[in-house]
Amino acid sequence: DSLNNMNERIILSSMDGFEVYKIADIIRCEANGSYTTFFIKEDRKVVTSKTLNNFEKLLSDLPFVRVHSKHLVNINYIKKYISGRGGYIVFEDGSQVDVSERKKKEFIRLMKVHARST
């Protein structure tokens, strides 16, 4: 069940070892070449030397969605979506990421599945 999986932990390798985080605390992940930066609750950032594709597969059964070639987001932290060509997402912490035109339709579909809409 997806909720139980969100309580699981993820090991993120760092330069000097690794750190363990609750999956539920991950707000979003951002690709930077062959590195991925994790944005975690309480303004924490962790850079790992694995690609975003790797983490997209690892988190595929959870409420994470790829909204752009550079962005994998936890939909539980989305505050609002501003439409446009692709549009962009605003998170609870005030940060923003673009949604690509190609990913927009699937993103909106998944949001409606995971949240009650009016």
Residue ranges and their predicted role:
Residues 1-92, 96-98:
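Conserved binding/recognition cores within well-folded domains
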Residues 32, 107-108:
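General helical structural elements
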Residues 56, 108-109:
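A cross-family signal for key residues in well-ordered alpha-helices
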Residues 100-104:
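Short, Lys/Arg-enriched C-terminal cap helix and immediately downstream tail that follows
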Residues 109-118:
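Short, charged, intrinsically disordered terminal tails
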